[in-house]
Swiss-Prot record:
Entry EC number(s): 7.1.2.2
Subunit-structure text: F-type ATPases have 2 components, CF(1) - the catalytic core - and CF(0) - the membrane proton channel. CF(1) has five subunits: alpha(3), beta(3), gamma(1), delta(1), epsilon(1). CF(0) has four main subunits: a, b, b' and c.
Protein name per UniProt: ATP synthase subunit alpha, chloroplastic
Record keywords: ATP synthesis, ATP-binding, CF(1), Chloroplast, Hydrogen ion transport, Ion transport, Membrane, Nucleotide-binding, Plastid, Thylakoid, Translocase, Transport
Organism, scientific name: Carica papaya (Papaya)
Job description of the protein: Produces ATP from ADP in the presence of a proton gradient across the membrane. The alpha chain is a regulatory subunit.
Gene3D superfamilies, sorted: 2.40.30.20, ATP synthase alpha/beta chain, C-terminal domain, P-loop containing nucleotide triphosphate hydrolases
Residues carrying the site annotation Required for activity: 363
Gene: atpA
Residues annotated to bind ATP: 170-177
Reaction(s) the record says it catalyses: ATP + H2O + 4 H(+)(in) = ADP + phosphate + 5 H(+)(out)
Primary enzyme class: translocase
GO MF term list: ADP binding; ATP binding; proton-transporting ATP synthase activity, rotational mechanism
Localization (cell): Plastid, Chloroplast thylakoid membrane
Length: 505
């Protein structure tokens, strides 16, 4: 027979009393009124805050965006197919944040910073808010270091500095993403962390970019944030902010970062969809009234930090697609007014075989020569002037049949300079190679060659200079100026290579 021992029972009761933790948990709960199209209307949740995360019964997370008198409009971060009318929703008391760490380098993730490349979880000890305020005026300093893209046309005439925001704009299929990926490839060995954000792109296009980066070893210093065209609008809207939060993490660790948004007009479309479904009043082109703020708060996060904060930087390259060259549409004009310049890619130039198809005439960089090394400033000024004069002459020459010798020479020089700006995709040039190429063109060394021979000669000259006269590269990389000694070495190399080239031909 079982005996009941009073002392044992009293010990158990005493232990339980000691372990008793009096905790009152207050949870704000609401009820789903209606759900559909990625939007849920919720009754209750009286104390929910704008932008707060809410959790549905079946695990889906949403963001409270519309706080109305009798209900709350929530956008869903998922398909929400299992959410039922009448089910309960609880407020989490948090706003959207993501884990951040150096382990993200080389990975492909979604807008919630979850890996989507099938290579396992990513460990992270810290987290950052997806939407954090941009650095203030005192926290910044003016842009003064170059961020080399490896493209002659950009680095010589539309230079980009670390901490700048430069828009890449053009019609579809004009090589916008190619300019951005070439810039990532050119950061190899430059100690720059790159973040590529694909918003509403085809999954095949994103896969192609990732493959290119992997083949060239660029994924070692790159993070890809992808929300493809089949993702919910909420996640497409959040993806750029996730990318910015990751880039900021490295920026505040005194590192240089480059972030590419491809493209913010898709983000604006996702935001328009959410806003219209939430019954917010539509404005121009049916976009909501705060679509400017959508992009300005994102792009203002790019900065060159002051010396007190470690001089880290975040350079932003947003890519905007235009419809048949219409730069005056709503989103393009918004982004142009926020950024520090734009690189305009033209379909006509692309079809004429001028690639990268950069229209140098209407592309600008508002940072200008502050973002160039001295050596580049010394050779690039002449190039821009000669190309501008050539463009003017070319338009005039179409109507005039008999041109004097000087005009003919200027046209011939201009055609060779245009040839010199052409580059193959995924073949960025070092700054020393660019300086050598520009000097050769602007000083008339290419004038004696046929237009078709220019590129071949330049490729051979670069190889010849690298193998036979390595001191040229050493002078420019150490002094950052185009010294008389460097000029003498370059002139010798050009003459020697020209003799060899003409013998071959």
């Amino acid at each position: 027979m079982v005996t009941i021992r009073a002392d044992e029972i009293s010990n158990i009761i005493r232990e339980r009393i000691e372990q008793y933790n009096r905790e009152v948990k207050v949870v704000t709960i609401g009820t789903v009124l209606q759900v559909g199209d990625g939007i849920a209307r919720i009754y209750g949740l009286d104390e929910v805050m704008a932008g707060e995360l809410v959790e549905f019964e079946e695990g889906t997370i949403g963001i409270a965006l519309n706080l109305e008198s009798n209900n709350v409009g929530v956008v869903l971060m998922g398909d929400g197919l299992m959410i039922q009318e009448g089910s309960s929703v609880k407020a989490t008391g948090k706003i959207a944040q993501i884990p951040v760490s150096e382990a993200y380098l080389g990975r492909v993730i979604n807008a919630l910073a979850k890996p989507i490349d099938g290579r396992g979880e990513i460990s992270a000890s810290e987290s950052r808010l997806i939407e954090s305020p941009a650095p203030g005026i005192i926290s910044r300093r003016s842009v003064y270091e170059p961020l080399q893209t490896g493209l002659i046309a950009i680095d010589s005439m539309i230079p980009i500095g670390r901490g700048q925001r430069e828009l890449i704009i053009g019609d579809r299929q004009t090589g916008k993403t190619a300019v951005a990926t070439d810039t990532i490839l050119n950061q190899q060995g430059q100690n720059v962390i790159c973040v590529y954000v694909a918003i509403g792109q085809k999954a095949s296009s994103v896969a192609q970019v990732v493959t290119t980066l992997q083949e060239r070893g660029a994924m070692d210093y790159t993070i890809v944030v992808a929300e493809t065209a089949d993702s919910p609008a909420t996640l497409q809207y959040l993806a750029p902010y996730t990318g910015a939060a990751l880039a900021e993490f490295f920026m505040y660790l005194k590192q240089h970062t480059l972030i590419i948004y491809d493209d913010p007009s898709k983000q604006a479309q996702a935001y328009r969809q959410m806003s219209l479904l939430l019954r917010r009043p539509p404005g121009r082109e049916a976009y909501p009234g705060d679509v400017f703020y959508l992009h300005s708060r994102l792009l203002e996060r790019a900065a060159k930090l002051s010396s007190q904060l470690g001089e880290g930087s975040m350079t932003a390259l947003p890519i905007v697609e235009t419809q048949s060259g219409d730069v005056s549409a709503y989103i393009p004009t918004n982004v142009i007014s926020i950024t520090d310049g734009q690189i305009f890619l033209s379909a006509d130039l692309f079809n004429a075989g001028i690639r990268p198809a950069i229209n140098v005439g209407i592309s600008v960089s508002r940072v200008g020569s502050a973002a160039q090394i001295k050596a580049m400033k010394q050779v690039a000024g002449k190039l821009k002037l000669e190309l501008a004069q050539f463009a003017e002459l070319e338009a005039f020459a179409q109507f005039a049949s008999d041109l004097d010798k000087a005009t003919q020479n200027q046209l011939a020089r201009g055609q060779r300079l245009r040839e010199l700006l052409k580059q193959s995709q995924s073949a960025p040039l070092t700054v020393e190679e660019q300086i050598m190429t520009i000097y050769t063109g602007t000083n008339g060394y290419l004038d004696s060659l046929e237009i078709g021979q220019v590129r071949k000669f330049l490729v051979e000259l670069r190889t010849y200079l690298k193998t036979n006269k390595p001191q040229f590269q050493e002078i420019i990389s150490s002094t950052k100026t185009f010294t008389e000694e460097a000029e003498t070495i370059l002139k010798e190399a050009i003459q020697e290579q020209m003799e060899r080239f003409l013998l071959q031909e």
